[in-house]
Regions:
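ABC ATPase nucleotide-binding domain signature region
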Residues: 31-32, 44-104, 363-372, 376-429, ...
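Catalytic Walker B motif of ABC-type/P-loop ATPase nucleotide-binding domains
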Residues: 160-164, 169, 401, 472-478
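Flexible loop/N-cap segments at domain edges
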Residues: 303-406, 423-424, 428
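Conserved H-loop
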Residues: 194-200, 221, 509-515
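Hydrophobic anchor residue at the start of the ABC signature
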Residues: 149, 461, 491
């Protein structure tokens, strides 16, 4: 199988933390999945492949052009056309259309007359119904994601490095994404927790203990192989424990038998001649030396078995160690937490007035396609945007978690952000809470921009839910994005235990059902 890209003995260290150690890999033609728990280095590996992260050892060799699509949205000061092509060409086409084009303008677009139709087709396929000069900040998170992906798929011969590409996409957007990936001739490496998307890959690469392991087949085949590996690992641990106990029993028995023979021999030697006693003493010395060597060998075997058992135990404990997250208790005695009446949104395709009453303990889903106004509605409720008209009343305190964690300073560390937002808590308290979310060691001290999307989300969840003020209403804008399956279950459990009201935007039906959504507002 021809390799598109080769990694040779790649090593990477952040501070004192090793991320990869002498990793080698060949990326084949076609679609490959990349999986790992949050914070294991998926985004970092994509940056290494793209040449944006400097390695401490080894080299990366490409045989094809490649393009990276990051999790982060495009710059908000750009227009749609700037994300699809050189904005200068768009300005030239405008002057041509208006009859103001110069001779230099006509020369500059001589080979690009097809571009305006291409841009329009890309927007139509991605279901982005907006003019080319629309500012990016006016688009929803899903529309921004599709815009970045649409440009990537236009590079038909490039190998694509896609970082959580299904994040923020509605169901039709996810179907569009799957079709585009399957039909992309250049191939792709897809880092994702989206099981449905990973069922379309030819093989899966797993980041495992600072290295990489490759599994043939799609996600379901990968899970079967992982389960077999886990069963074999546990069986090996059990076999090692049995062998350890047997070796230890033999060692103890040998020591006991030798001590018994020594006591019996001492009684006999008291009645024997000196020459005979010397001869027996010599034989006993040789026997003792032989026994010592035998016991030393047994001791080495015991230590080896103990080390193997310890390694397996550590691996298993890391896999099974539960994360902990609890939301602050609802303090309000009022039944109604939110009341909307004839609310008119400032942005989004939903142009009808919205009326809604949310009571304590209710779980509401805000449904609708990308661009319908779901995030806009949450921002209006949170007081970050002003409605065109209508009534928006909240009672008690609310927490709002937006898609981009905009309230966090990405240049500051997790601890610095938490101290700034909640100065009343001690460092030891934040350390304990971060550790319970598997953010340990130097990780809480690194700038947030160096953490994975899932790790940043955990910090954001702590920031909005673990302050000293109780929360009555929580607004969550696609919180299941970025999270691995284990962390997603953690969030489900926390929401289920919360006694206040929840307004949720999500496109993941399994997540929606898991948290017990009992009501829905549809903006389509």
């Amino acid at each position: 199988m021809t390799a598109i890209c080769t990694l040779e003995n790649i090593s990477l260290i952040f501070g004192d933390t090793p991320i990869f150690h002498k990793v080698s890999l060949e990326l084949p033609i076609g679609i490959t999945g990349l999986v790992a728990p949050n914070g294991s280095g998926k985004s970092t590996l994509l940056s290494v492949l793209h040449g944006q992260a400097s390695v401490t050892g080894g080299k990366v060799s490409w045989r094809r052009r490649h393009h990276l699509v990051k999790q982060l949205n495009p710059r908000l000061d750009l227009r749609i056309v700037d994300c699809l092509a050189d904005g200068h060409l768009y300005e030239v086409f405008l002057r041509v259309e208006q009859g103001h084009a110069s001779e230099d303008d006509l020369i500059s677009v001589a080979d690009y007359w097809h571009l305006p139709l291409t841009w329009q087709r890309q927007l139509e396929e991605a279901k982005i119904n907006a003019p080319l000069d629309t500012p990016i900040e006016r688009l929803s998170g899903g529309q921004r994601a599709k815009l970045s992906l649409a440009y990537a798929f236009s590079l038909s011969s490039d190998y694509l490095l896609l970082d959580e590409p299904s994040n923020h996409l509605d169901q039709s957007g996810r179907e569009w994404l799957q079709e585009k990936i399957l039909n992309h001739a250049g191939g792709a490496l897809v880092a994702s927790h989206d099981v449905e998307l990973l069922e379309n890959v030819r093989q899966i690469i797993e980041i495992y203990q600072r290295g990489l392991k490759t599994y043939g087949g799609a996600y379901s085949a990968y899970m079967q192989q992982k389960e077999s590996e886990q069963a074999a690992l546990l069986q090996r641990a059990e076999d090692n424990r049995k062998e350890f106990n047997q070796l230890n029993n033999v060692r103890q028995k040998s020591l006991h038998n030798f001590a018994t023979r020594q006591r019996q021999g001492k009684g006999k030697r008291n009645s024997q001649s000196k020459s005979l006693m010397d001869s027996q003493k010599d034989r006993a010395g040789k026997g003792l030396g032989k026994l010592k060597r035998k016991l030393e060998q047994r001791q080495l075997q015991l230590e080896k078995k103990r080390e193997e058992i310890s390694k397996i135990t550590v691996i298993e404990s890391q896999r099974l160690r539960p994360q902990k997250l609890s939301l602050t208790k609802c303090d309000s005695r009022k039944s109604i937490q939110l009341h909307l009446e004839n609310l008119q949104l400032p942005y989004g395709s939903h142009d009808k007035p919205i009326s809604l009453t949310v009571r304590k303990g209710e779980r509401w889903r805000i449904a609708g396609g990308n661009g319908s106004g779901k995030s806009t509605l949450l921002k209006v409720i949170a007081g970050q945007l002003k409605a065109l008209s209508g009534v928006c009343q909240t009672r008690g305190s609310l927490c709002y978690l937006d898609q981009g964690f905009s309230f966090l300073n990405k240049e500051l560390s997790a601890l610095e952000n938490l101290f700034y937002l909640h100065p009343g808590r001690k460092e030891s308290e934040w350390r304990t809470m971060l550790g319970s979310l598997r953010l340990r060691g130097d990780t809480p001290l690194l700038p947030l921009r160096l953490l994975s999307g899932g790790e940043q989300l955990k910090v954001a969840l702590l920031a909005v839910t673990r302050g000293t003020i109780a929360t009555d209403l929580i607004l969550l804008d696609e919180p299941d994005n970025h999270l691995d399956l284990d962390s997603r279950q953690l969030l489900v459990n926390a929401i289920m235990d919360f006694s206040g009201a929840v307004l949720l935007v999500s496109h993941d039906l399994s997540f929606i059902n898991a948290i017990g959504v009992d009501s829905q507002l549809n903006l389509d």
